[in-house]
């Protein structure tokens, strides 16, 4: 992640285009903005990665690496569940729905924050840097990386913009899914989920 949020966001956008994940002729939104405080319209521009100090870049790359590691562990363990269902012959008889409740979290600063320091950003160096991600630590990655995670949209969690509300929903249910491996651009909302599960269970 030392490449920085500008280069990585561009690379993610190119992959989205190559995979044809979006309809029409979408464009990558400009580099994001940083909300001055939660639920307020006042913002300031997100700084370019190359404008940051080396210490800031190293701290921020570590924050994103920690988040990516958590996602990787989650993915591996979801895979373990799926493998067990396959082994028991139950995968095609199991309805799996995987989704997110909102877009990436930009709290509370372009550079993130730590549980120990509250909303204030602190650049970790030396031994502090080595301790990041260990038990007892708590680091948010901030607006810069949230802008990457919401590629190609604008804004973040808390906001009724695409970056806050447009998230993937992955569904698996054997032969009940007609378009296996395909994309469906039909909008859905969390209020749809309960009624869907009730119907599938044959309940009323």
Set out the residue ranges of the language-model regions.
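Long, well-ordered, tryptophan-enriched scaffold segments
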Residues: 1-50
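A long, amphipathic alpha-helix that forms part
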Residues: 3-9, 14-15, 56-94, 104-106, ...
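Short helix/loop capping segments that flank catalytic or ligand/cofactor-binding pockets
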Residues: 25-26, 107-108, 117, 163, ...
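Short, flexible, mixed-charge acidic loops at enzyme active sites
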Residues: 42-54, 112, 166
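Conserved catalytic/binding loops enriched for acidic/polar residues
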Residues: 97
């Amino acid at each position: 992640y030392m490449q920085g949020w500008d280069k990585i966001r561009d690379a993610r956008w190119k992959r989205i285009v190559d995979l044809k994940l979006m309809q029409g002729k979408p464009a990558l939104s400009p580099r994001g903005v940083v909300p001055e405080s939660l639920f307020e319209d006042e913002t300031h521009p997100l700084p370019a990665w190359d404008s940051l100090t080396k210490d800031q870049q190293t701290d921020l790359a570590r924050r994103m690496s920690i988040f990516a590691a958590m996602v990787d562990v989650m993915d591996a363990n979801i895979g373990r569940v799926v493998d067990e269902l396959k082994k028991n012959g139950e995968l095609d008889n199991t309805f799996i729905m995987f989704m997110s409740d909102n877009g990436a979290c930009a709290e509370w600063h372009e550079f993130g924050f730590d549980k120990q320091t509250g909303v204030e950003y602190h650049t970790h160096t030396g031994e502090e840097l080595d301790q990041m991600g260990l038990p007892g630590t708590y680091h948010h990655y901030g607006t810069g990386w949230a802008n990457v995670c919401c590629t190609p949209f604008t804004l973040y969690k808390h906001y009724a913009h695409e970056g806050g509300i447009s998230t993937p929903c992955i569904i698996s249910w054997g032969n009940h899914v007609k378009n296996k491996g395909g994309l469906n651009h039909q909008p859905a909302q969390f209020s749809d989920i309960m009624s869907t599960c009730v119907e599938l269970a044959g309940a009323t």
